[in-house]
From Swiss-Prot:
Protein's UniProt name: NADH-ubiquinone oxidoreductase chain 4L
GO biological process: ATP synthesis coupled electron transport
Organism: Echinosorex gymnura (Moon rat)
Keyword annotations: Electron transport, Membrane, Mitochondrion, Mitochondrion inner membrane, NAD, Respiratory chain, Translocase, Transmembrane, Transmembrane helix, Transport, Ubiquinone
EC identifiers of the protein: 7.1.1.2
InterPro entries (alphabetical): NADH_UbQ_OxRdtase_chain4L/K, NUOK/Mnh_C1-like
Protein's gene: MT-ND4L
Highest taxon of source: Eukaryota
Function description: Core subunit of the mitochondrial membrane respiratory chain NADH dehydrogenase (Complex I) which catalyzes electron transfer from NADH through the respiratory chain, using ubiquinone as an electron acceptor. Part of the enzyme membrane arm which is embedded in the lipid bilayer and involved in proton translocation.
């Protein structure tokens, strides 16, 4: 296995561990999710270079689009929580109801 792939797998594991450990603040959870998506994106980009398939080269771009949508929704929810309650605790998510 290449050293780059091992580093990206370790980055994914570290981001997952960070998501499990620092889940009290919403901003920390969003940063860990972005780290996970970035490591998955790099792993998919490296693996599609090995396949030399033009159809498979589209998948990392689709993942990047979904990651951007996830980040936009997460940041808008963070702004809503911080404007309403003044903090970014995850426990305030239960209080948001339409």
């Amino acid at each position: 296995m290449q050293m780059t792939m091992i580093n990206m797998i370790l980055a994914f594991i570290m981001a997952t561990t960070g998501l499990l450990m620092f889940r009290s603040h919403f901003m920390s959870s969003l940063l860990c999710l972005e780290g996970m998506m970035l490591s998955i994106f790099i792993l998919m980009s490296i693996s599609t270079l090995n396949f030399n398939n033009s159809l498979a080269m589209m998948f990392p771009l689709v993942l990047l689009v979904f990651a951007a949508c996830e980040a936009a929704i997460g940041l808008s929810l963070l702004v809503k929580i911080s404007n309403t309650y003044g903090t970014d605790y995850v426990q305030n998510l239960n209080l948001l109801q339409c």
